From Swiss-Prot:
Catalytic reaction annotation: XMP + L-glutamine + ATP + H2O = GMP + L-glutamate + AMP + diphosphate + 2 H(+)
Claim: Transferase is one of the keywords in the record: no
Record EC number: 6.3.5.2
Job of this protein: Catalyzes the synthesis of GMP from XMP.
Name this polypeptide is given: GMP synthase [glutamine-hydrolyzing]
Extent of the signal sequence: none
Organism: Campylobacter fetus subsp. fetus (strain 82-40)
Oligomer status and interactors: Homodimer.
Residue sites binding ATP per the record: 222-228
Gene of this entry: guaA
Domain GMPS ATP-PPase residues, every copy: 195-385
Length: 510
């Protein structure tokens, strides 16, 4: 069992895994565990510090979440964030109650006492609040380190016991010096910067070899970053026992199937088995409008196709997937985070399947996956491709998926990507795609009235996909995209731009 420098106990915040990501960026290996994990399991990880995450519950409620009491008797530094802060206060006898003024968004943090936790942090900085409860009194043995306009006890601590409590979220990018504070906490814990993708690759290769033995692994690839890195990692570990399969589900972008085959065969040197199952997928999606049903159908059909292919080969015991940490958090596998949406590659395999899962990327973030890809020798054009969802264009078409709607979306999507690349904006953004709204609107083309489809452009900036902001594209670029799509794609007469951030919206529409 791998030791963790810092354990993050998950009380249900959608930001929880950002805490681990921020620490890992600084070379500190942080691992998530459910809030109710046993003290024995915590001790087995031999952590140097513990972080209590935020969460949607209230410490005074009947259904409040509490961690094992032993957490506070280990003698380790503890950092409580938001709900974790209120839990620290509650456990030390302070009153926590509903706030008269809820705080959501940016706030000014004012430091009133300097200490190691605030090393490198200015006296006043912007932090990100997201809470509806308030600590009304200072716990015994603690002192105030910082306040905000609406929070007298915004940061308090017991410096002797190294217990720190923050009302805000340092892990969110909007907190200007949040990274610095987390780095300082890691130093207080005595952590060193030893976590990197080079060491991860070596350990993962060895773990894969030990697990697989003489059995074979069926690796599903889509051409996206995640599956490409999984295939490369497995090729390093078990080149003779690896079967790489690409399924054309009929939900890919223009020429994508051909590009995937060329990439794996020519650039990665992988013997790729290509299966055209487009008719099967589209037939099963016929008449289906609900996004969750679409995801489930696509996921189940993928598994079925892979299982059929696996039976053609002897000793196939495992199926490899590119499941990431962000997939897990949005499907609420860890801790008590509330479900946002299911992911096609999260949740295990059906009982009828005859092989087990291998998910070597399950505990790392997208930025770590990219660094791992470079470490494994993949080219930058592969590693820095925009993310593309497993369910493909099916979740970028509102409502029913059919060949005509797919064709419209493909044509619009090509134009968007062409314009972004020619203007130099493609590499500046995290993800860019079109959404076919399946909503008609009135237009005028020439002297004729039209009543045709509207398409939405979705372009976002992000570092890990956990949070995202819409890209501030130049108006001229947006105008070019709109003009070309309307003029070149028959059946579309309106283009809109999505200016929603995540949260509250998700990046994909379905």
């Amino acid at each position: 069992m791998k030791n963790a420098d810092i354990l993050v106990l998950d009380f249900g915040s959608q930001y929880t895994q950002l805490i681990a990501r921020r620490l890992r960026e600084q070379g500190v290996y942080a691992e998530l565990m459910p809030f109710n994990v046993s003290i024995e399991a915590i001790k087995a990880k031999n952590p140097k510090g513990i972080i209590l995450s935020g969460g949607p519950a209230s410490v005074y409620a009947k259904d409040a979440y509490f961690c094992d009491e032993g957490v506070f008797t280990l003698g380790l530094p503890v950092l409580g964030i938001c709900y974790g802060m209120q839990l620290l206060a509650h456990k030390n006898g302070a009153d926590v109650a509903p706030a008269g003024h809820k705080e959501y968004g940016k706030a000014n943090l004012n430091i009133v006492k300097k200490c190691d936790f605030f090393k490198g942090v200015p006296d006043t900085s912007v932090v990100w609040m997201s809470h509806s409860d308030k600590v009304n009194e200072l716990p015994q043995g603690f002192e105030v380190l910082a306040n905000s306009e609406n929070s007298e006890f915004c940061v308090f601590a017991n410096l002797d016991k190294k217990l720190y409590a923050l009302q805000f979220h340092p892990e969110v990018a909007h907190s200007e010096f949040g990274d610095t504070m987390l780095k300082n906490f890691a130093k207080i814990c005595g952590c060193e910067s030893t976590w990197n993708m080079g060491s991860f690759a070596k350990k993962e290769v060895q773990a894969i070899r030990e697990k697989v033995g003489n059995d074979k692994v069926l690796c599903a690839v889509s051409g996206g970053v995640d599956s490409s890195v999984v295939a490369a990692l497995l090729a390093h570990a078990i080149p003779d026992n690896l079967i790489v399969v690409f399924v054309d589900n009929g939900l890919l972008r223009t020429n994508e199937a051909k590009q995937v085959e060329e990439m794996f065969k020519l650039k990665l040197g992988v013997n790729l088995i290509s299966i055209d199952a487009s008719e099967l997928f589209l037939s099963r999606l016929k008449g289906v409008r609900d996004p969750e049903k679409k995801r489930k159908i696509i996921g189940e059909t993928f598994i079925e196709v892979f299982d059929k292919e696996a039976k053609k080969h002897s000793n196939v015991k495992y199926l490899a997937q590119g499941t990431l940490y962000t997939d897990v958090i949005e499907s609420s596998v860890v801790g008590s985070s509330k479900t946002i949406k299911s992911h096609h590659n999260v949740g295990g395999l059906p009982e009828w399947m005859e092989f087990e899962l291998i998910e070597p990327l399950r505990e790392i973030f997208k930025d770590e996956v990219r660094r791992l890809g470079l470490e494994l020798g993949l080219s930058r054009d592969i590693v820095y491709r925009h993310p593309f969802p497993g369910p493909g264009l099916a979740i970028r078409i509102m409502g029913e998926v059919n060949t005509s709607s797919l064709e419209l979306l493909r044509k619009a999507d090509v134009i968007l990507r062409e314009e972004l690349k020619s203007s130099g904006w493609y590499d500046k953004t995290w993800q860019a795609f079109c959404v076919l709204l399946n909503v008609n609107s009135v237009g005028v083309m020439g002297d004729n009235r039209t009543y045709e489809n509207a398409v939405c452009l979705r372009v976002v900036d992000a570092s890990d996909g956990m949070t995202a902001s819409f890209s501030r594209l130049p108006y001229d670029l947006l105008e070019n995209c709109s003009r070309r799509i309307i003029n070149e794609v028959d059946g579309i007469n309106r283009v809109v731009y999505d200016i929603s951030s995540k949260p509250p919206a998700t990046i994909e529409w379905e």
